[in-house]
A protein has these predicted regions:
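Carbohydrate-binding surfaces of carbohydrate-active enzymes
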Residues: 391-404, 410, 427-428, 669-756
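Glycan-recognition surfaces
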Residues: 419-426, 516-533, 577-684
Length: 756
C-alpha cells in the first residue's frame, strides 16, 4: 500500500538526517513514531486522520532498556545515533546497542543486532512503551486499545522470536501474573470507588486450589490478568513491554513474583537450568498502530504472515479469523452412536470426547494410546466398540476431528519418564549431594546444603505428597530438612512411586524435583529437552492414533520449567513442527489457560463452563461467579475468541429459543463453546432437530461473515431476542427481532463477498 504523508513538513522531517532537536520520525501506513536524540519515543500518531499524540508528554518510552539481574538495575539510553536503518544506543554502564529499525507497510520491525560490551547485562527490554490510551488493556499480546467510535485506534507489539516474551526483565521468574488489577475501561459508566485506584492489585478468590473459586469479582472495573505484556499506571494509561534474556547460564529464581501472595500458592526458589545457545542477541519485535477495527485482520495477520510466525488454520482459515470461530461438540455419557450425525446436522467439525479419561503423556506407548495394535476399544456404540484410531478414521470420512483431554506435560507415575524408572531429564529445582553412603533401607539421608529444601515443591498448591528428591533412579519422598549440621532430610519414604530403593554412594547428586499438582494431575515436570520430546509425542499421538484436537488441562504446568512463555512457545513449536513433518493438519487445541506463549498456536479457550460462564436462562455472563465476565474481557482485549466454556446440553427441557439466544450472543461477542452433548439426553429432546437447524443456520452465516458490526452490537443486548432464517431460493439470511414470540423488525444479511 502506498503510504500517506500527513504534510510536506512531515515528509521533510522523514527525509532529513534529523530534526532540529535531533529527533527522527518513522511511519507505516497507519502509524508514525518520533524518536528523540536520546533514543526515546516521544511521539505516537494515527496516520489515518488528525489525532492527538498517544505518547504521554510526561512519560517518553525508551526504545530499548538493559537489565542487570545481579544488582537489579535498569539502564536506559543516554544517546542515540541513527544511520543506515540502525540506531546506535549508548548507555550509562558503557554498553552500546545496535538496533535495526525497518519500516514495513503496516508495522516497524525492531531487532537487537549487537550489544558490546555487555558489562553485566543479563536481559534486554523493549520499552516500556507508554501510551495515554486508557480504554482496553490487552495484557497478553501487548496492546493498548481505544475502541470508542471517536478514537478507534490501537497500539501494540508482537514478539518475533521465541526468546522474546511478554513482560519486564525485572521479573526473572517469568511465571506470569495472577489475580486482579483495578482498571475501568469506561470511567463515566463504571467509575472507580474512592477506595480503589488504577493498577491496584488483588489476589484471586478462594483457597488457591479450587480454580472455580478464583473468579470472585463481578464489578467491571476488576480486571483479571492472564499476561503482563501490558499494564496500567496509576492514571489507567496502558504501557506495553517485551523482554529477552541470556538463558545460556542458569539462574536462581523466586517464582512467582510481581503478584500479591496467594494462599497455597506461595513462591518457591528454583535453580533454572542452562539453555545452550539461547541469548537475547537477535531479539525482535513488531511495533504497530492502526485503527482498532482493522487491527486483527489487516495488521496483526500481516505481521504473522510476513514474519513467519505460527499461522495455524482450521477449515482453511486462520484460527484467529472471527468468521472461523465455531463450537466444538464435547461429549458426556459414553455412548457414541449418533454423535457424528449430530455434528453433521449442525455443521460442526470437532468431537471432543470429554467422557474419556484424561490422557497422560507417556512416550512409552509411541503415540499408540490404545496399544500397538489398537487393542483398547474405548468408544462405545450400541452394537460395537471402537479404538481411538478406528473412531477417528470413521469420523474423518465425514471431515470430522476427534479430540481428547490430556494433562499437558505432567508425567504421571507409571509412565515411561516418571516411574518405576525415572528419567534423568526431569525438571530439577535444586541439586545437592550426599555426604554419607546409603544402603537400601536407610532413611537418614545426609546432604551438603539444606538451602530451600524446606519448601514444599511447586508453588502451585504445594502438594505435600509430591515433595520428593531423586538419587540415581530412585524417587524418595520427604518432608522437612534439619537446620543444623549434619543436614539431613526428614520423614523419608524410600522407593517412592514404585521405584527401586538401592545403594547410593557419598557424593551422588540429590535432585529435588519439580512436580505438577495432586489428584488427577499428579506427576513430575520435564526439563526443557524432555519437554521437547513430549511435544513431539503429542504429534505422534495424532499420527498413530488419529486425534486432531487436544484439551490441555494443566496447561499452566508448561510454566513450571521456570521459563514462562519461552517454555510454552518452545513446546508448541516442537509439536506443530512434528505434526507438519508427518503431513498432518494443524492441531486444534484448547486448554486450562491462555498466554502470550500459546496465543499464536491456540485455536480456542473453552475453559470452565455452566453457570460460572454463562447463564442462558438469566442471560448473564456468570450467575454464580465472575468467570464469564473475566474471561470474556481477557479474550476480547487480546483479539482471541471468547467462550461459554463447556455448556448448554440439549435435554428434554431445551428450547429453540434458548439456542437462538446462545448463537446470537456467541456471534455478537465472538464466542466459541464446548457444546455438551450426551446422546441419551439429546434423544429425550422433542425439539432436537429444530435446535440442530438453529445452530447450523447461525454458524453458516457466521462463516460467511454476514454480520456487520452494528448488528453484532445489537446481538450483545441480552434484553433482545432473535431468530435467523435462511432466505429461500437465494443466498443470505433474514434476522428477525422477536417480541413476545412474534417476528418484529427484520434485517437482511448477506455473505460479505456477496454483490448485494
Amino acid at each position: 500500500m502506498k503510504r500517506k504523508y500527513i504534510s510536506l513538513a512531515a515528509m521533510a522531517l522523514l527525509l532529513s538526517a534529523c530534526g532540529t532537536d535531533g529527533s527522527r520520525s518513522f511511519q507505516t501506513d497507519y502509524f508514525r513514531i518520533d524518536i528523540d536524540a536520546k533514543g526515546y519515543i516521544v511521539g505516537m500518531w494515527n496516520q489515518t486522520k488528525e489525532s492527538r499524540n498517544f505518547s504521554p508528554a510526561d512519560q517518553p518510552s525508551p526504545l530499548l532498556a538493559l537489565y542487570d539481574e545481579d544488582i537489579k538495575r535498569y539502564y536506559y539510553p543516554q544517546k542515540a545515533h541513527y544511520g543506515g536503518g540502525r540506531y546506535r544506543l549508548e548507555y550509562e554502564n558503557g554498553s552500546v546497542a545496535t538496533v535495526s529499525l525497518d519500516e514495513k507497510d503496516k508495522y516497524f520491525k525492531l531487532k537487537l543486532e549487537n550489544l558490546e560490551p555487555r558489562n553485566g547485562i543479563d536481559g534486554i527490554q523493549w520499552g516500556n512503551y507508554y501510551t495515554n490510551i486508557t480504554n482496553i488493556l490487552g495484557e497478553m499480546i501487548g496492546v493498548a486499545r481505544d475502541t470508542t467510535e471517536a478514537v478507534n485506534y490501537a497500539i501494540g507489539a508482537l514478539a518475533l522470536d521465541d526468546n522474546t516474551i511478554g513482560g519486564e526483565s525485572r521479573y526473572t521468574s517469568e511465571t506470569g501474573p495472577s489475580g486482579y488489577i483495578v482498571h475501568t475501561p469506561d470511567p463515566v459508566n463504571h467509575p472507580l470507588p474512592l477506595t480503589l485506584h488504577e493498577g491496584q492489585q488483588f489476589t484471586m478468590g478462594g483457597d488457591g486450589i479450587n480454580d472455580v473459586a478464583f473468579y470472585n469479582r463481578k464489578e467491571p472495573y476488576f480486571r483479571i490478568l492472564y499476561g503482563n505484556t501490558a499494564f496500567v499506571d496509576c492514571n489507567g494509561r496502558i504501557n506495553i513491554r517485551y523482554h529477552s534474556r541470556d538463558r545460556r547460564k542458569g539462574k536462581m529464581i523466586y517464582s512467582p513474583e510481581g503478584n500479591p501472595i496467594f494462599q497455597n500458592n506461595e513462591p518457591n526458589h528454583m535453580m533454572r537450568q542452562d539453555v545452550p545457545g539461547v541469548d537475547f542477541i537477535g531479539s525482535s519485535i513488531a511495533l504497530w498502530g492502526s485503527p482498532d477495527s482493522i487491527a486483527l485482520m489487516d495488521v496483526i495477520q500481516n505481521i504473522v504472515k510476513e514474519e513467519g510466525l505460527p499461522y495455524p488454520t482450521f477449515n482453511g482459515k486462520w484460527v484467529k479469523d472471527p468468521t472461523n470461530y465455531m463450537p466444538d461438540i464435547c461429549t458426556y455419557g459414553g455412548l457414541m452412536d449418533s454423535v457424528a450425525s449430530y455434528a453433521k446436522q449442525m455443521g460442526l467439525k470437532v468431537i471432543h470426547t470429554y467422557d474419556q479419561p484424561f490422557l497422560q503423556a507417556d512416550r512409552g506407548n509411541g503415540g499408540f494410546i490404545d496399544g500397538p495394535n489398537h487393542e483398547k476399544k474405548r468408544y462405545h456404540f450400541t452394537d460395537k466398540d471402537l479404538s481411538t484410531r478406528e473412531y477417528a478414521d470413521l469420523l474423518a470420512k465425514d471431515g470430522l476431528i476427534l479430540g481428547r483431554t490430556s494433562i499437558s506435560n505432567s508425567m504421571a507415575p507409571g509412565t515411561k519418564d516418571c516411574s518405576p524408572v525415572p528419567s534423568d531429564s526431569i525438571c530439577i529445582l535444586h541439586r545437592r549431594f550426599l555426604t554419607a553412603d546409603l544402603n537400601e533401607t536407610d532413611t537418614m539421608i545426609y546432604i551438603d546444603d539444606p538451602t530451600h529444601l524446606e519448601e514444599i515443591a511447586c508453588w502451585e498448591g504445594h502438594t505435600k505428597e509430591l515433595n520428593m528428591v531423586k538419587i540415581g533412579k530412585e524417587l524418595i519422598h520427604y518432608l522437612g530438612v534439619t537446620k543444623e549440621k549434619p543436614y539431613r532430610l526428614m520423614n523419608v519414604t524410600r522407593g517412592y512411586w514404585g521405584t527401586q530403593a538401592t545403594v547410593h554412594e557419598k557424593g551422588e547428586a540429590v535432585d529435588k524435583l519439580q512436580p505438577a499438582v495432586g489428584g488427577a494431575y499428579t506427576g513430575l515436570i520435564p526439563n526443557l529437552e524432555l519437554q521437547d520430546e513430549l511435544a513431539r509425542h503429542y504429534a505422534d499421538i495424532c499420527k498413530n492414533s488419529g486425534l486432531g484436537m487436544f484439551d490441555y488441562d494443566g496447561q499452566e504446568f508448561f510454566f513450571h520449567t521456570g521459563f514462562g512463555a519461552y517454555s510454552v512457545k518452545r513446546f508448541f513449536r516442537n509439536m506443530f513442527a512434528q505434526a507438519k513433518q508427518y503431513g498432518l493438519p494443524d492441531i486444534r487445541f484448547t486448554g486450562a489457560t491462555l498466554s502470550e506463549g500459546s496465543w499464536h498456536y491456540q485455536s480456542i479457550w473453552n475453559v470452565g463452563g455452566g453457570l460460572n460462564i454463562y447463564d442462558v436462562k438469566k442471560r448473564v455472563w456468570g450467575s454464580t461467579t465472575s468467570q464469564g465476565k473475566d474471561l470474556r474481557d481477557v479474550t476480547y482485549a487480546n483479539f482471541f475468541p471468547s467462550s461459554f466454556g463447556g455448556n448448554f446440553p440439549i435435554t428434554a427441557e431445551s428450547t429453540v429459543e434458548d439456542y437462538e439466544h446462545i448463537e446470537a450472543t456467541a456471534i455478537g461477542y465472538g464466542c466459541t463453546y464446548a457444546f455438551k452433548i450426551g446422546q441419551k439426553d439429546v434423544e429425550s429432546c422433542p425439539q432436537k432437530y429444530a435446535i440442530f437447524r438453529v445452530i447450523r443456520t447461525w454458524e453458516e452465516a457466521r462463516r460467511a461473515d454476514a454480520f456487520p458490526t452494528n448488528i453484532k452490537k445489537m446481538l450483545q443486548d441480552p434484553s433482545l431476542s432473535w431468530r435467523l432464517e435462511k432466505k429461500e431460493g437465494k443466498e443470505g439470511w433474514t434476522l428477525y427481532q422477536m417480541v413476545n414470540g412474534q417476528k418484529g423488525k427484520s434485517f437482511d444479511l448477506y455473505p460479505k463477498q456477496s454483490t448485494h
